[in-house]
């Protein structure tokens, strides 16, 4: 009897030993040595990768930014109020990733790609690293397709092409964000996904932007990433990289995307704050030595891909805020040298009622001309020169009252062209309508219209064309060039409208 029991016991023990599984969770763990201002110094993590995501026992997360001989400098997402000396830190062995694809479209996210719009979780299996290598020379193609903003002054004088980087620069309160929002609204029906990255903006300002996009039906094809002024410097620093990762998904899947960084001045300030806390040596204006590189590696990811890669594109419109119109400061000059041109907005023009307040003389597009449609080129070919001569004459008339007839005529024409380029915010104009009104101004159809009535003339001209001659607009849209027949027809239409137009 006792023999049997012993056998039973030994067989049970053997069975248990055979089926025994040890669930052990292997993790590399370090300890926080010090924590201040959103940066933790961690000891005991030797094999950490640069910008690897680390998890704190408090539930906070961060990335390894400084890899030193015996410690790691970790930038903490959020404010890490519960982190203190001795807190455990665990490696995740993965780099920073954000959700990408169509699942993020129409959503408002934070810098980590987490939804903050109260519309539930993002259901997707597609994630992308926020730090990716920019496409090489052989993977690219010259910019040749237009990306129309719907703003006459931009599409005629500083045209933007798909895959271009065009800087919007100016003092605060000059309408920089409005130009960017107009560009987003104008992409409706163009199969372009738009990403708006707000860096260091007020929450109320971002809420206003989202409301505007919803009002014009633009949120259907847009993503908003918000790292507001109340967020930590780490979140403000990461936001543009999260945004560009989402844009790259569409670029690499043979689609088109537009990304707006609003603004990179605040991004540079956030990076300066992080770098100084990490005790990296400061350089000019106390910015670290690699502040140029953080922007160049971000903006180089905007590209027009070659046909073999699917011919997708990512267009970038970075915004930079200047102080008292000083474009020669450190960050503005850096970004001017990285981008393919700039749109310069001026306070004086803004307050004198010329809106959008684009300084035509200082604004330039280095590659967009190749993307401009032929019809726009035909009507705006001499526009820049005419406006420059008008500004010169205008300055001259302040001292001399007696002008010859030719100069008077030029002055009159210039005044009307300035009026033609004025545009209300959030009212982008299709390219065919832009061609018509610029043609009317350039060919003298507005010479007999008083300067104050030019805007009214335009407001009445478009409905007249849509009602009586929709084929003219349709032909400009499809042909993209003003041939002799179309030009003759356009002249006839404008002459007929002038007879019916009463001031």
Curated annotation (Swiss-Prot):
It is an enzyme of class 7 (translocase). It comes from the Bacteria. It is a peripheral membrane protein. ATP binds at residues 170-177. It is found in: Cell inner membrane. GO terms for cellular component: plasma membrane; proton-transporting ATP synthase complex. Signal peptide: none annotated. GO terms for molecular function: ADP binding; ATP binding; proton-transporting ATP synthase activity, rotational mechanism. Produces ATP from ADP in the presence of a proton gradient across the membrane. The alpha chain is a regulatory subunit. This is ATP synthase subunit alpha. The lineage of its organism: Bacteria, Pseudomonadati, Campylobacterota, Epsilonproteobacteria, Campylobacterales. The gene is atpA.
